[in-house]
Regions:
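C-terminal cap/linker of serine protease catalytic domains
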Residues: 58-66, 120-131, 136-138, 220-223, ...
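N-terminal secretory signal peptides
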Residues: 1-27
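N-terminal export signals
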Residues: 31-53
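N-terminal activation segment of mature serine protease catalytic domains
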Residues: 49-100, 104-107, 170-172, 209-214, ...
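Catalytic-histidine neighborhood of serine endopeptidases
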Residues: 37, 100-170, 180
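Terminal peptide-recognition signature
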Residues: 72-77, 95, 105, 109, ...
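Active-site substrate-binding loop(s) of clan PA
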Residues: 66, 162-164, 180-234, 319
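Active-site region of chymotrypsin-like
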Residues: 73, 178-200, 236-313
């Protein structure tokens, strides 16, 4: 007996031919591909998550190198009076070593920090009229030990200093180290000094751009200064930021307007007036002279650019100009 074909069954059978056959090997390959893609995405996400900390570590390491490079060329200033408190020392600000002892031992700082020690200044003459012993009230510079990080502050050396030149319009003054504190005035005896300052390497300010990293290396805030055996013990500090402005004009603490200055958002406390503004290689790009107004204003610190200092400082050293 012959069975007739069922049209519906035949149609169903024909449709079934359009359904792909189950291929376990192909599915396995797809699973492997998806697994590899997931692993790739996962490792990519992990890499993204690790990028910021890695960059942060690089930045921290560089900042540490900047501090170690610049700090041994940054000095603290103070007025010494044997009848005063804190061992006779009153903090005055910061200076930057411009020339090593062999080249004369010159330090650059802010004019307003040392103005009462400028020869012929009204305040200096007033002290003389009051019969105050000028040989006892001295301007002194604290030269740090060669290794600043972890170094014992007692390895630093105080030196007597004199003002050899000033430019009030730029709020810049140049000092000369005379002799280690307590010695008879004369040329610095390098052999007797515990610490020997080195001149800070000079950078260039002409190629600076807004947004570049900048660091202020100076003396710590005097309000938080530690004492050592009752004496003032300077501590070098650093603040970080960027160059936030170029060719600015700003009122100075001398009543003048300083022109062509650099602006930075790195904090400049008054104890760091005269501090070094350095680039990410630890090279001097400016000397911090002021903040805007009478108080510390975040984002409004100013420095005389090093390209200008290269014109000002040699003239003050050579001609002993007081202006």
């Amino acid at each position: 007996m012959t069975l007739d074909s069922d049209p519906e069954h035949d149609e169903a059978r024909d449709v079934s031919r359009d359904v792909p056959d189950f291929d376990s090997r192909r599915l396995g390959r797809r699973r492997l591909a998806l697994g590899a893609l997931g692993a790739s995405l996962g490792s990519g996400l992990a890499l993204l998550c690790q990028t910021e900390p890695a960059l942060a570590l690089v930045d921290e390491a560089n900042a540490t190198r900047v501090f170690e490079t610049a700090s041994r060329s940054v000095v603290s200033l103070a007025v010494y009076d044997p009848n005063g408190a804190n061992g006779g020392y009153t903090p005055r600000g910061t200076g930057v070593v411009w020339a090593a002892f062999e080249q004369g031992g010159f330090v650059v700082t802010s004019f307003h920090v040392v103005k009462d020690f400028v020869p012929g200044s009204p305040s200096k003459e007033s002290d003389d009229k009051k019969n105050r012993d000028a040989s006892q009230r001295r301007l002194r510079v604290n030269v740090p030990a060669e290794k600043t990080n972890g170094a014992d502050p007692r390895n630093a050396t105080w030196y007597d200093a004199v003002v050899v030149g000033t430019q009030r319009a730029s709020d810049i003054a140049v000092l000369r180290l005379i002799s280690p504190a307590g010695d008879v005035e004369g040329d610095v005896d390098v052999e007797k000094s515990v610490s020997r300052p080195a001149a800070l390497q000079l950078g260039s300010s002409g190629s600076l751009r807004v947004g570049q990293s900048a660091y202020v290396v100076g003396a710590g805030d005097v309000k938080g200064a530690d004492s050592l055996k009752g004496a003032y013990s300077p501590q070098t500090t650093m603040s970080a930021g960027v160059i936030s402005g170029l060719r600015r004009s700003v009122p100075s603490k001398n009543g003048t307007t300083i022109r062509n200055v650099l602006q930075t958002d790195a904090e400049i406390p008054e104890s760091s007036a005269g501090a070094a503004l350095v680039d990410s290689n630890g090279r001097l790009i400016g000397v911090a002279v002021t903040t805007y107004g009478n108080t510390v204003s975040p984002g409004l610190g100013f420095a005389v650019p090093v390209d200008d200092l290269l014109k000002i400082v040699p003239a003050l050293i050579t001609l002993h100009q007081i202006s």
